[in-house]
């Protein structure tokens, strides 16, 4: 059973099917106030009933069923983007994607059992690839995306014996 949908930020590649899915199954959506404002501004989602949208604040844990969820700030070019640390009392997982930089994110990623971590691009391939220069600059910027190399460094910073699963994603 799905008790809620956690949204990290309002970019289209993260919310494209949110309207239809949430309305069809009446599943609550949880996101920061800035992200919810961005979701409401994206007209292609259609009308989302206010009762389905729930604001969560950075560094203010909340409960969803048996889960304790701790939203944390991330560096990305969106309205108040977040990652999530999720604890069921036995295991702790985190979602940290769309990171431009990760310096202040590391503390939220310590002592995990599993993590979904961004590994977005090979720097050389991005530099010589077909994207226009402004997009390349955005992707490599402090509010863009984490390179594969920096993702590896972050993983080394949080690695410990109980970290059993690492899922690389965008």
Task: Name each model feature, range by range.
Residues 1, 56-114:
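Core dinuclear metal-dependent hydrolase active-site scaffold
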Residues 1-32:
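Active-site metal-binding motif and surrounding structural segment of the metallo-beta-lactamase
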Residues 10, 34, 74-77, 97-99, ...:
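Active-site metal-binding loops of divalent metal-dependent hydrolases
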Residues 15-16, 39, 124-125:
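Glycine/Thr-rich phosphate-binding loops of Rossmann-like dinucleotide-binding domains
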Residues 18-21, 39, 105:
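Hydrophobic packing residues within well-ordered alpha-helices of enzyme cores
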Residues 35-41:
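Short, charged/polar "capping" segments at the starts of alpha-helices
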Residues 42-49:
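Short, conserved SAM-binding/catalytic segment
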Residues 104-169:
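Cap/insert and terminal regions of metallo-dependent hydrolase folds
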């Amino acid at each position: 059973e799905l008790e809620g949908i956690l949204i990290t930020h309002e970019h289209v590649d993260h919310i494209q099917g949110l309207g239809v899915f949430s309305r069809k199954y009446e599943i609550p959506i949880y996101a920061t106030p800035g992200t919810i404002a961005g979701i409401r501004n994206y007209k292609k989602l259609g009308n989302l009933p206010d009762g389905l949208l729930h604001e969560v604040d950075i560094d203010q844990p909340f409960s969803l069923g048996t889960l304790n969820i701790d939203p944390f700030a991330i560096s990305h070019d969106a309205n108040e983007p977040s990652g999530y640390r999720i604890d069921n009392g036995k295991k702790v997982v985190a979602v940290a994607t769309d990171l431009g930089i990760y310096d202040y994110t590391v503390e939220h990623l310590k002592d995990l059992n599993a993590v979904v971590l961004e590994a977005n691009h090979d720097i050389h391939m991005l530099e010589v690839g077909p994207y226009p220069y402004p997009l390349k600059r955005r992707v490599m910027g402090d509010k863009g995306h984490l390179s594969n190399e920096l993702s590896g460094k972050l993983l080394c910073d949080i690695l410990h014996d109980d970290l059993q699963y690492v899922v690389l994603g965008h």
